[in-house]
Amino acid sequence: MHCARYSTGTCRSCQWLEKPYPQQLSDKQQHLEDLLQPHAVQRWLPVQPSAQTAFRNKAKMVVSGSVERPLLGMLHRDGTAVDLCDCPLYPTSFAPVFDVLKVFIARAGLTPYNVARRRGELKYLLLTESTQRGTFMLRFVLRSETKLAQLRAAMPWLQQQLPQLEVISANIQPVHQAIMEGKTEIILSDAAALAEQFNQVPLYIRPQSFFQTNPQVAAALYATARDWVAELKITSMWDLFCGVGGFGLHCASSEMRLTGIEISAEAIACARRSAEQLGLKHVEFQALDSTQFATAKAEIPDLVLVNPPRRGIGSELCSYLSRMAPDYILYSSCNAESMAKDMTELANYRALRVQLFDMFPHTAHYEVLTLLKRA
């Protein structure tokens, strides 16, 4: 992949860009195999590659410059702004949206936030595309509600120019820190969730719910989990840290009892909507802390699926799962180092199969799926 920003040194986010893509994949696989060497993996499956360009469905743009000439992209530590509207990681459908948004910022009078002066209102634009329908979710991250009336008044023009904007919201982030979003989300459009679909499974993305940024690889990850679980002939399953339900909804059958747990109420609302649309009768999604839920339950499911944040599932949940001893644990991780640590604590489980998914090309990061069976 060629990137003019990388060549000039103005953006080095893709740290492995100079490394040939096959070498990227082999280096990631070697890193994973080294980490899991103590765990005697029975079967390694081939790496799931990614497209090398236009694979991201989400843009997180810092807004800088002036209200008349806004810049969308990133800020270096010295305050230098870099416009990333032509970043090759984004699909070609993003650039026309960015062009209109620059005009809209001026029309609505949304003054970009100046980090050095601590003045201005508009901090970030967060844009997510549905690969199913080509529609978008747009979030304006504002310092306060001061410009909210102006934003609402100017929205009809924006919706006329960009009818593909399905969900529009304002997030209020008042803190002078490099934090992407605050707690308050104000829905400005009729729709509150972006419709998506992977492998004939309907999924919904609300503004504050987590969703994978590489749809092609995410679809392969979910399909693989579905296929592995189908081979096991299980009747009950927990999906912990379930997000909008992507894993559980793929794995659930009409007769399986599925319980999905996620701390985000917004994500749970999306998961419930998908389950209802699929007609699943034995599925329950709850907005709870995954560790607290699991350690408070007496029943033992056949399989526990975990998809934790980068820190992993942690000692408390590892200890409880070891005592509870479900037949299988399916572990999806975006940080193989924390997963390897958790696997060490799950000493009474052996790794049946492992597969790497290249969710983040041109970086050292990747996703990994591991099936564990009680020894």
From Swiss-Prot:
Keywords: 4Fe-4S, Iron, Iron-sulfur, Metal-binding, Methyltransferase, rRNA processing, S-adenosyl-L-methionine, Transferase. The keyword Iron-sulfur applies. The active site is at residue 334. It catalyses: uridine(747) in 23S rRNA + S-adenosyl-L-methionine = 5-methyluridine(747) in 23S rRNA + S-adenosyl-L-homocysteine + H(+). GO terms for biological process: rRNA base methylation. One of its GO terms (molecular function) is rRNA (uridine-C5-)-methyltransferase activity. Pfam families: tRNA_U5-meth_tr. Gene3D superfamilies: 2.40.50.1070, Vaccinia Virus protein VP39 (3.40.50.150). [4Fe-4S] cluster binds at residues 3, 11, 14, 87. S-adenosyl-L-methionine binds at residues 212, 241, 262, 307. Its EC number is 2.1.1.189. It is an enzyme of class 2 (transferase). Belongs to the class I-like SAM-binding methyltransferase superfamily. RNA M5U methyltransferase family. RlmC subfamily. Catalyzes the formation of 5-methyl-uridine at position 747 (m5U747) in 23S rRNA. NCBIfam families: meth_trns_rumB. This is 23S rRNA (uracil(747)-C(5))-methyltransferase RlmC.
